[in-house]
Amino acid sequence: CIVETVTPELGVEYAKNLGISTLTSTDLNPATALGGITDGVSNLELTSAFAAIANGGVYTEPIFFTQILDHDGKVLLDNQPETHRALKDSTAFLLTDAMAESVQTVSSFARPGATINSTSTRARLSNMSVAGKSGTTTSNNDIWFVGFTPYYTAGIWGGCDNNQSLSSNGGTSFHKDIWRKIMERVHEGLSDPGFAVPDSIETAQICRKSGKLAVEGVCDHDPRGNAVYTEYFAKGTVPTEVCDKHVVVTVCAASGMKPTEYCPEKRSKVCMSIPQDAEGSTDDSAFGIPGYCNIHTDLSTIFTQ
């Protein structure tokens, strides 16, 4: 569990720095990483925490008015919110990029032609970049969606006063529909600038099978298609190792298997490196290094083709 590496103490410190005020000493445990906190969290504080991510890591105290004027226009109260940096701008952007995927439909690399709906596609806006995260409590007693665009952040909570479980038959998705319909109205007439990439971020070409630097001409020739994608990194954290999952082997041009001494023509083929002691199978298993050619097994097979 990553929270054990980070430590619950540091995780709680970050949450408090993002404006979560309900945390107690009993929340210094790994369950807090999943939202299992003793006194829960208000929609206002959770939405404000997400707004800090949307704001490049700068937290702004939520306020409900900026000024109160008298009948002559004199300022009686000037309400300026407290702000402070809660996250590095690179961290905020990487979180934004990750949460943007939760509202997208993505192609399945393992099964070409198939698509995968992420958890919050119902919150996707027609002409605006969106990032966000949905969540539920035990037995669907509470449902959440908090998301943001380059302009605004909004949070929707759904539940019952008596804490009863919501129906799984559509009862756990309506909050995303509410969020989408409100935000569609709010963003009418606004152009989509996308999420700004800070100078503290750099990109690299990564192999999706190894998570390491892609090898040109190899990782992009995976039997299932191009396994290379562009990933964002905080500067100085780009991987230095290159992919070790894709290998180029010489095979018989006819059988596609490792050549024997009798194979008349050979070609190169990209395969997956499967550990010799691997048990079971994965999506990569069908694309491992093949056995020896079963067509050209002796000298006579050369002259019968």
Sequence positions of predicted segments:
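Poly-acidic low-complexity segments
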Residues: 5-7, 88, 252
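A penicillin-recognizing enzyme superfamily signal
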Residues: 40-245
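Active-site-adjacent bridging/hinge elements
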Residues: 12-26, 124-125, 153-159
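Active-site-adjacent helix/loop patches that line small-molecule binding or acyl-intermediate pockets
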Residues: 1-20, 27-55, 98-101
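Low-complexity, Gly/Ser/Thr/Pro-rich intrinsically disordered linker/tail segments
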Residues: 205-305
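A short, terminal or domain-edge coil/loop segment
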Residues: 18, 78-85, 173, 177, ...
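Amphipathic repeat-derived elements
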Residues: 5, 59, 63, 191, ...
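Short flexible/disordered coil segments
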Residues: 17, 25-28, 91-96, 137-138, ...
